[in-house]
């Protein structure tokens, strides 16, 4: 069952301006080390950051909190699976919120789609609760996004 949905669009030019104006202060405030390494190594650096920024906004909406109630930027890290598919690594308040959203007897699955076409970057996040009989036997802290 779907327990959360979020979507966001980001103007890449806005991220270009933030990178030029604030540099590392901006990237260190909003992005994880993994995200910074990935984006800084790309020719389309600003577009890469913009997709991740939109993904974080969409994730915070799917969690039902926005960027408040203990959910912070760097607690929602966009990571890529070996196949290249983007997904999230959630920590701190974001992970706690995911645990609280997930019904007993279920495990969470977070789905992420990101794209860009200058000057726009867009992200969609769906949080799904999958039935899992083993989830009844596990303490809540074993959930991983």
Curated annotation (Swiss-Prot):
One protein family per Pfam: ACPS
NCBIfam families given in the database record: acpS (TIGR00516), pantethn_trn (TIGR00556)
Protein name (record): Holo-[acyl-carrier-protein] synthase
Location of this chain's protein in the cell: Cytoplasm
Keyword Lipid metabolism: yes
Family annotation (HAMAP family): AcpS (MF_00101)
Protein keywords: Cytoplasm, Fatty acid biosynthesis, Fatty acid metabolism, Lipid biosynthesis, Lipid metabolism, Magnesium, Metal-binding, Transferase
Source species: Methylocella silvestris (strain DSM 15510 / CIP 108128 / LMG 27833 / NCIMB 13906 / BL2)
Amino-acid positions noted as binding Mg(2+) in the UniProt annotation, renumbered to this chain: 8, 57
Reactions performed catalytically: apo-[ACP] + CoA = holo-[ACP] + adenosine 3',5'-bisphosphate + H(+)
Superkingdom classification of source: Bacteria
Family: Belongs to the P-Pant transferase superfamily. AcpS family.
Described purpose of this protein according to its UniProt entry: Transfers the 4'-phosphopantetheine moiety from coenzyme A to a Ser of acyl-carrier-protein.
């Amino acid at each position: 069952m779907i327990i959360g949905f979020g979507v966001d669009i980001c103007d890449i030019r806005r991220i270009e301006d933030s990178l030029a104006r604030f540099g590392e202060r901006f990237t260190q405030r909003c992005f994880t080390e993994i995200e910074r390494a990935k984006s800084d190594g790309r020719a389309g650096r600003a577009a890469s950051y913009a997709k991740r920024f939109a993904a974080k906004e969409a994730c915070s909406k799917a969690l039902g909190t926005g960027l408040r109630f203990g959910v912070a930027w760097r607690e929602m890290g966009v990571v890529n699976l070996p196949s290249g598919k983007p997904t999230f690594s959630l920590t701190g308040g974001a992970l706690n919120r995911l645990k609280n959203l997930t019904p007993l007897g279920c495990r969470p699955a977070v789905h992420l789609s990101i794209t860009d076409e200058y000057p726009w970057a867009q992200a969609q996040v769906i949080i799904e609760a999958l039935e899992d009989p083993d989830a009844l036997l596990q303490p809540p802290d074993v959930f991983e996004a």
